[in-house]
A protein has these predicted regions:
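Beta-propeller domains
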Residues: 1-18, 54-63
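Asp-box/WD-like beta-propeller blade repeats and closely related beta-sheet repeat scaffolds
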Residues: 21-24, 47-88, 113-117
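Loop/turn segments within WD40 beta-propeller blades
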Residues: 28-37, 80-90, 128-135, 174-181, ...
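Conserved strand-to-loop turn within each blade of WD40 beta-propeller repeats
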Residues: 43-46, 96-99, 140-144, 152, ...
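WD40 beta-propeller blade core
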Residues: 50, 103, 116, 148-150, ...
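Solenoidal tandem-repeat scaffolds enriched in leucines and small polar residues
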Residues: 79-168
């Protein structure tokens, strides 16, 4: 169902925060305040990784804090923060780019300092993500159909694992913020996989959702729920409670006003449980919707 909101207020806030910039391919809020202000990172179509803060004032104002170039003639494709579990005022960021590279950056004293960069994939490195529970480990997925894991304490030229379980490009990865070792991945092959990070030879569970799985998001409070942005097949809420037994099921499918589902996330507020924001590409649409879990959905 569509939620009931105050559209005039939402429009006003968004309008004050508008900023002209190149195409943004990924954007994520910082789990912690930066200099006492909410902040987010993004990567864009001119190969920049940038950090922005929201000014603490009566009006929402977005200010660019800093930026770093990911390389010549590349697109920035994804980013992730290291401080979702272990809070830090000096977190690391991992980014990926269209030349197949993955980068690590350290945020200290208002500077985003490059730590390392390596060629992770033969083609576009669509996605990179930290292991939320062990941020020495970084995952990456590429258009070469490979899902890889990297230990930052070792030589980053050699992955600790390289999986060909997905049959097409790997474009989404997220480490579960609620249960250690759980990892979900999505691919153009239309499959959502859940893994145990300690044993990456085979996934725990495999579910075909009928569209390229461009983004995956674990629920911030319920480890059983995964949200997918499924490109030409809308958005799905998946029950993964029994994924360790090889079972997953779609419990909600949203496909209203969707041209190409590219973005999706849960609301983190306890006041709006199961409130979801999604966005589609060609029609420039932002959707806000909720679903209601009933007992047989998650039995």
């Amino acid at each position: 169902m569509l939620g009931q909101f105050q559209p005039h207020l939402a429009k006003s806030i968004l309008g004050k925060g508008d900023s002209e910039m190149p195409g943004v391919l990924d954007i994520k809020w910082s789990p912690d305040m930066l200099n006492g202000s909410p902040a987010f990172g993004l990567v864009n179509s001119v190969g920049m990784a940038e950090l922005y803060v929201l000014n603490n004032s009566a009006e929402v104002k977005v200010t660019k804090l800093l930026g770093v170039n990911l390389g010549e003639n590349v697109l920035g494709l994804s980013l992730d923060w290291s401080n979702r579990i272990n809070k830090s005022t000096t977190p690391q960021l991992t980014t990926s780019s269209s030349d197949g590279c993955v980068q690590i950056h350290q945020l200290t004293q208002g500077e985003l300092t490059p730590v390392c960069s390596w060629k992770a994939h033969d083609y576009e490195a669509w996605i990179t993500a930290f292991d939320n529970w062990n941020t020495n480990v970084v995952y990456s997925g590429g258009d070469d159909c490979r899902l890889k894991g990297w230990d930052l304490r070792q030589n980053s030229t050699s992955p600790v694992f390289s999986s060909k379980r997905h049959e097409m490009g790997v474009c989404s990865i997220q480490s579960c913020p609620i249960r250690e070792y759980l990892l979900c991945t999505g691919s153009y092959d239309e499959h959502l996989l859940v893994w145990d990070g300690r044993q990456m030879k085979q996934p725990l569970a495999d579910l075909r959702v009928g569209g390229g799985v461009w983004r995956v998001k674990w629920h911030p409070r319920h480890a059983r729920l995964i949200l997918t942005a499924t490109m030409y097949n809308g958005y799905h809420v998946v029950d993964a409670q029994h994924s360790t037994d090889g079972k997953m099921a779609v419990i909600h499918h949203y496909d209203e006003d969707v041209s190409l589902g590219y973005g999706a996330d849960w609301c983190y507020s306890d006041s709006y449980d199961n409130l979801i924001a999604t966005c589609s590409f060609y029609n420039h649409a932002l959707q806000l919707w909720q679903f209601t879990m009933i007992s047989h959905d998650v039995g």
